[in-house]
Swiss-Prot record:
It comes from Saccharomyces cerevisiae (strain ATCC 204508 / S288c) (Baker's yeast). Keywords: Activator, Nucleus, Phosphoprotein, Transcription, Transcription regulation. One of its GO terms (molecular function) is transcription coactivator activity. It is found in: Nucleus. Component of the Mediator complex, which is composed of at least 21 subunits that form three structurally distinct submodules. The Mediator head module contains MED6, MED8, MED11, SRB4/MED17, SRB5/MED18, ROX3/MED19, SRB2/MED20 and SRB6/MED22, the middle module contains MED1, MED4, NUT1/MED5, MED7, CSE2/MED9, NUT2/MED10, SRB7/MED21 and SOH1/MED31, and the tail module contains MED2, PGD1/MED3, RGR1/MED14, GAL11/MED15 and SIN4/MED16. The head and the middle modules interact directly with RNA polymerase II, whereas the elongated tail module interacts with gene-specific regulatory proteins. This is Mediator of RNA polymerase II transcription subunit 6. Residues 211-243 are annotated as: Disordered. PANTHER family: MED-6-RELATED. Belongs to the Mediator complex subunit 6 family. One of its GO terms (biological process) is positive regulation of transcription by RNA polymerase II. Component of the Mediator complex, a coactivator involved in the regulated transcription of nearly all RNA polymerase II-dependent genes. Mediator functions as a bridge to convey information from gene-specific regulatory proteins to the basal RNA polymerase II transcription machinery. The Mediator complex, having a compact conformation in its free form, is recruited to promoters by direct interactions with regulatory proteins and serves for the assembly of a functional preinitiation complex with RNA polymerase II and the general transcription factors.
Amino acid sequence: MNVTPLDELQWKSPEWIQVFGLRTENVLDYFAESPFFDKTSNNQVIKMQRQFSQLNDPNAAVNMTQNIMTLPDGKNGNLEEEFAYVDPARRQILFKYPMYMQLEEELMKLDGTEYVLSSVREPDFWVIRKQRRTNNSGVGSAKGPEIIPLQDYYIIGANIYQSPTIFKIVQSRLMSTSYHLNSTLESLYDLIEFQPSQGVHYKVPTDTSTTATAATNGNNAGGGSNKSSVRPTGGANMATVPSTTNVNMTVNTMGTGGQTIDNGTGRTGNGNMGITTEMLDKLMVTSIRSTPNYI
């Protein structure tokens, strides 16, 4: 059976939210329903103790709305001194929400793994920290307990996620960098070629616009030649002047029996028969003045 890693898991419980709602006061209770929560943590122990204490003494309640609390030795201490070991962000949460101040006071009496509300951005973002409390020297000590952070979780709306570790983040960044670097090298490899005479060199880029223009001109030229071979639909007095190239080809064919004539010397390719320039001029004038016959 494949188990999804916790850092790839997204969990939510719409049914729980529909019954109890989701706010800062009960966000830890909502988190306790998720698979991220450790049932052996101190939070679970305190939760069970509260349930039994409420059954034994229904009128038991602690007023935590004041800034002064009574210490076990009977002396009053200032909350700033009591929670001096807590970071300022969490300290503001403790002062604003008395229930978390009471939870912190109870956690101070225990050693082990615990969950605390680390950051709040109402109405839809909370950060919960998993930490280990060790060397607990008791309530009211100036030194305070030693706290080791273990893991952070964040709640966005109704979804709970486990924050990735530094190793996962660096690994993801390195894999992304390696992928893009490999793609770049493959693109560069396609731009070079090897020739025995020149060695390795870059290919000459082909101008696609020039190629497209040449192809278009070729199509237009082909279309023009096709149009010239079609008989016009106008009157009978319309005539077409044949090109010099066609006349020369005709003369060459007539005078040499299909052999080629050198236009510069006026001689055939084999030198057996020849046509003078004067004969070519007469044939040119005759062909221009004549009326062409269309096929």
